[in-house]
Amino acid sequence: MTEQTIDNILPASKNNVKQWYVVHTASGAEKRIKEDILRKIAKQKMTDFFEDILIPVFGVSEVKRGKNVKVEKKLMPSYILIKMNMTDKSWHLVKNISGVTGFLGSKIVPKALTESEIQNIFNNLEAEAKVAKNSKLYEVGEVVTVTDGPFETFMGTVEEIDKERNRLKVSVSIFGKATPIELNFNQVKKND
């Protein structure tokens, strides 16, 4: 009976085909683990087996101690993405790094991401970055002008900001009465 190893199970490993894999890590240790993997790759002269290591992050601005500070938020906390040729040797290199808890997939054979799954992750990163950027454009209490829809040209005051849904609740005056309406970020503009 043949021993079950990655080299025996995955045909891609023999052809030097690099695919994306998801690695689960200890919480908050993603950067250190990425650096440790890169050091070990160089030390063991295995650069041909690895193409890229990503920590999916996007930048957001936050107010800390009264100052606007740019910080990185993780799209997938406790996970890193590695584009690699999966062999027994490369699998062991990553798996034996302190803080790595495993690959996504079965215990014996990690599951490579499909092109659509990878594209979805990159699209989510882009969308999160856009939401973070747009949500910082508006502040509660700020006066804006509606630029689209039935209330186009109405002026209103921002009451709530929903960053997840990319929406604002704006209070506009209709027949002299303040009426709250929900709008997308792209349906309003700041007043100069």
From Swiss-Prot:
One Pfam family cited in the UniProt record for this chain: NusG
Source superkingdom: Bacteria
Keywords (A to Z) from UniProt: Transcription, Transcription antitermination, Transcription regulation, Transcription termination
UniProt-listed GO biological process terms: DNA-templated transcription termination; regulation of DNA-templated transcription elongation; transcription antitermination; transcription elongation-coupled chromatin remodeling
PROSITE patterns: NUSG
Occurrences of domain KOW (ranges): 140-168
Transmembrane annotation, as ranges: none
InterPro entries with a match to the protein in the record: KOW, NGN, NGN-like_dom, NGN_dom_sf, NusG-like, Rib_uL2_dom2, Transcrpt_antiterm_NusG, Transcrpt_antiterm_NusG_bac_CS
UniProt xrefs under HAMAP family: NusG
Name of the molecule in the record: Transcription termination/antitermination protein NusG
